[in-house]
């Protein structure tokens, strides 16, 4: 098969015109993976009481609410983790979904944990909504709200 300059020009024009359609889709996939990694880093940092990682992942404007409506800013959130008396035996974030919306990501998952305080084991299963924001090249946790699940969940 012989390709002419005209054939190559047509292919080139097509390739260049398709780039704006392909690149955002690929960027979304890269961003989803980066957010997924940030969520996993947050889970591990909560378990390990890793203050440096928590400081890095949380946005300065963080609004963190618990299922009992208790609200914390970045400082209170990190201090609560660092001074907690309960020991997490496990913490998982199953049913993770991520939706990229510009420089924001909407993350939903369950919070499934087992913790122990004064010899008493507590199992927790709640729903969580997180909003992550891309600040520079990093994803930061901007907001988090948790909620009680229906009895059947």
Predicted regions and their residues:
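Positively charged n-region of N-terminal signal peptides that target proteins for export
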Residues: 1-6
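A beta-strand edge to alpha-helix "cap/lid" segment located at domain peripheries
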Residues: 9-17, 24-56, 63-153
């Amino acid at each position: 098969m012989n390709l002419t300059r005209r054939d190559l020009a047509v292919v080139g024009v097509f390739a260049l015109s398709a780039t704006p359609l392909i690149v955002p889709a690929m960027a979304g996939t890269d961003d989803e993976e980066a957010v997924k990694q940030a969520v996993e880093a947050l889970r591990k940092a909560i378990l390990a009481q890793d203050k440096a990682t928590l400081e890095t992942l949380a946005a300065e404007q963080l609004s963190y609410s618990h299922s009992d409506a208790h609200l914390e800013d970045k400082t209170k959130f990190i201090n609560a983790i660092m001074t907690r008396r309960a020991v997490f035996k496990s913490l998982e974030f199953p049913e993770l979904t991520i939706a990229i919306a510009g420089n924001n990501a909407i993350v939903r998952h369950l919070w499934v944990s087992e913790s122990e305080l004064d010899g008493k084991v507590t199992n927790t299963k709640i729903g969580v909504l997180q909003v992550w924001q891309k600040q520079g090249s990093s994803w930061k946790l901007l907001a988090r709200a948790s909620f009680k699940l229906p009895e059947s969940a």
